[in-house]
Design a protein with these regions (language model features):
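Cytochrome P450
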Residues: 1-247
Length: 247
């Protein structure tokens, strides 16, 4: 994607998961037009990669790979939105969520300043505590009994990651933000099994690098106002989070 237009990716990501009239877009029509621009832009890039030599970027890999080179328009657009939203929205909200969590738990911030090596374990704890996507829907492929309930083949099932990540039967003191938990990666934010997020290790690496650089450069990232949350039952994130940097 052209570097000069990279801000469009975050804009399209915000629009894809937003409801008109709450700060991102004013109407369903304006939302539709901006997403059409997104689809048109990537369709042109797809054709450009298709006609050129294989390259190392993700779009080129999809165009030339046996499993993805013959995607239908619907499949292409579905993968596109998944990559745009999953590739930046969740990470951005986890960064903001980490800042907020540390401010709400100053003792944990003190731990981090005393021992920046705790970043490795703090990253999955941020992802659990924030849970940037609240839920995901699946279709049952067979009848099953679960929790004294019958789920029929073809039923739509909503899995509330945000609930599982606060399950006291599995996670000790689940509502607390603790950066040195013994098993910090015991969470559901990335899904599970064949549907587990393909970019989970990349997301963890991005957050790790961000916090390594933050701790090198600044003593304190202070939240100085109330966060404004995204109006969504799907994305658990922030429109704004005012902070003050203290060197």
């Amino acid at each position: 994607f052209p570097q000069a237009k990279r801000r469009l990716l975050t804009r399209w990501s915000d629009i894809a998961v937003s409801e008109p009239g709450f700060g991102i877009v004013d109407s369903w029509e304006s939302r539709r037009l901006e997403l059409e621009d997104c689809f048109t832009t990537f369709a042109a890039l797809w054709q450009e990669r298709l006609q050129g030599e294989p390259r190392s970027d993700l779009l080129s890999l999809m165009v030339h790979a046996e499993g993805t080179k013959n995607l239908s328009p619907g499949e292409f657009l579905g993968n596109l939105i998944n990559l745009i939203v999953g590739g930046n929205d969740t990470t951005r909200n986890s960064i903001s969520g980490g800042v907020l969590a540390l401010n709400q738990n100053p003792g944990e911030y003190d731990k981090l300043r005393a021992n920046p090596d705790l970043i490795t374990g703090m990253v999955p704890e941020i992802i659990r505590w924030q849970t940037p996507l609240a839920h995901m829907r699946r279709t049952a492929t067979s009848d099953i009994e679960l929790g004294a309930k019958t789920i029929k083949k073809g039923d739509k099932v909503v899995m509330w990651y945000v609930s599982g990540n606060r399950d006291g039967e599995v996670i000790e003191n689940p509502n607390a933000f603790i950066i040195d938990r013994e098993r910090p990666r015991q969470h559901l934010s990335f899904g599970f099994g064949i549907h587990r997020c393909v970019g989970n290790r990349l997301a963890e690496l991005q957050l790790k690098i961000v916090w390594e650089e933050v701790m090198k450069r600044w003593r304190f990232v202070e939240v100085v106002g109330e966060p404004k949350r995204v109006r969504s039952s799907f994305v658990k994130g922030y429109e704004t989070l005012p902070v003050r940097i203290q060197a």
